[in-house]
């Protein structure tokens, strides 16, 4: 099981940091998904799977749109990645990474 409050704190911090950047469509998509996950994580039966989807989404959208996660943003994303590892090996094959509707 993951620490929901700590995870929400990381999501909140990453959201606030990204909102300080130029508001490109990709940044707005990522922050929208961060907000959806933040609101939904308390009621999830397996929140680590949701975090796994979130991290994959951020990496794929970031890569496709040449968004660089440096400094604290990189640290926060790595922390979320560490949390997402608790989802197990097969969770990454169960979703279309770029589809916002999975959140």
Q: What are these regions, as identified by a protein language model?
A:
Residues 42-77:
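Short, charged early-sequence alpha-helical segments and their helix-coil boundaries
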Residues 8, 31, 35-38, 55-58, ...:
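Generic structural concept
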Residues 1-35, 81, 93-103:
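Short terminal alpha-helical segments
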Residues 65-103:
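Amphipathic alpha-helical binding modules
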Residues 17, 21, 37-44, 60-64, ...:
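Surface-exposed polar/charged interaction patches
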């Amino acid at each position: 099981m993951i620490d929901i409050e700590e995870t929400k704190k990381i999501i909140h911090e990453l959201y606030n940091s990204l909102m300080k950047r130029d508001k490109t469509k990709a940044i707005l998509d990522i922050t929208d998904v961060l907000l959806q996950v933040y609101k939904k994580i308390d009621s999830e039966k397996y929140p680590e799977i949701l975090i796994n989807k979130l991290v994959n989404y951020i990496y794929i959208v970031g890569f496709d749109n040449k968004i660089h996660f440096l400094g604290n943003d990189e640290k926060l994303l790595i922390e979320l990645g560490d949390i997402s590892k608790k989802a197990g090996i097969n969770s990454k094959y169960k979703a279309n990474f770029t589809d916002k509707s999975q959140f």
